[in-house]
Amino acid sequence: MVQQKERETFSQRLALACDKAGLPLHGRQADLAVRLKVTPKAISKWFNGESIPRKDKMESLASVLGTTAAYLHGYADDDGITVNHLSRSNDYYRVDVLDVQASAGPGTMVSNEFIEKIRAIEYTTEQARILFNGRPQESVKVITVRGDSMEGTINPGDEIFVDVSITCFDGDGIYVFVYGKTMHVKRLQMQKNRLAVISDNAAYDRWYIEEGEEEQLHILAKVLIRQSIDYKRFG
């Protein structure tokens, strides 16, 4: 009973500390998971009053929030938090990296599981303006590519920056889309009254989405930028 009360007190204090520090409610748990290098599931248990972090993680959590472990435990009343010190600065642009892979290959089965944010990449607003042409940060996400059908343009393991606000065909380009029950990253090109689905790797044949088959096509995003994971070994 005592342990349950301690967990509940910690959960309440944690939420209050996050609010005062200015940590946005949307994405709060994922943000803390990235900062503290723990799993989103562990963070969820803290907020739900199911568990309390170990001493080292409690100290790290308190440091991030600008308070003390004693406050989070409920032993002290003064939180010591500087109001809104974690609120997003207008000088930064954050891009979420999502725990999902798009297939540049034969296709990946679509999962109904909730897609977690696993980390975020920060840019200055000027860097973001140049990279993303003024798109709002909510529209830009990063996912990992698997498969080799786009090799030469996008290689297996590369990360791609995508615009998730584009959910219909928006002119020739590379898209992340679902056809039937599989997810793909391919080049789409309108040819008369049908869409050509093109793999930049010549080993893969192109295929077509004909009139009457459009209902099976669901565009999720348009690809903006590729970030390569290529390594060169010199010793």
From Swiss-Prot:
InterPro entries on file: Cro/C1-type_HTH, Lambda_DNA-bd_dom_sf, LexA-like, LexA/Signal_pep-like_sf, Peptidase_S24_S26A/B/C
Membrane spanning stretches: none
DNA-binding region of this protein: 25-44
Coiled coil: none
Classification via CDD domains: HTH_XRE (cd00093), S24_LexA-like (cd06529)
MF annotations from Gene Ontology: DNA binding
Gene3D superfamilies named among the record's database cross-references: lambda repressor-like DNA-binding domains, Umud Fragment, subunit A
Domain HTH cro/C1-type: 14-72
Cited PROSITE patterns: HTH_CROC1
Highest rank taxon of the organism: Viruses
SUPFAM superfamilies named among the record's database cross-references: lambda repressor-like DNA-binding domains, LexA/Signal peptidase
Keywords, alphabetical: DNA-binding, Repressor, Transcription, Transcription regulation
UniProt keyword Transcription regulation present: yes
Pfam families for the chain: HTH_3 (PF01381), Peptidase_S24 (PF00717)
Protein name: 26 kDa repressor protein
